[in-house]
């Protein structure tokens, strides 16, 4: 199955003993089991050390000439206040020496849209900031929304392509995330290799009989 929502992936995997999926590390909960990858368990420590290998950036896409209100929210996200919220939500802050938030006192509506992986932490940021409306979709939609002006800020849980950047937006990394490979809690598998992940997702392996225990 192709699922565009983190919640759907969690529901599918928690309800099927043979299912496998991948989600944002920050969205991991006790309804599923995260596998070790190459013997390394996903954790804040192993992500920061580089021992856990499946990592990705959380980016936002914004246009030049951002409204004062939207710029203030971006400033909040990148401040020590915003970065602390990101860390408390289970993600890796990108600036441990960020300055404290200083408001520009702007007012106005701020629309943020995009990645379902980024949405949970963006909602926490918006709740603390109290002025942003977060709309969940997917990375590509969020970037398109930023390009065409439907949103002030697009959320992406991937690198923003050169083609997308050429359409008048810039990429700002707000956090680092790991991708947790998840299985049903009743699955006996505890560890998986990168080659095994590739084989499963390319369809060359379709059973658990020869996977790591």
Task: Outline where the language-model segments fall.
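Exported/periplasmic ABC-transporter solute-binding proteins
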Residues: 1-213
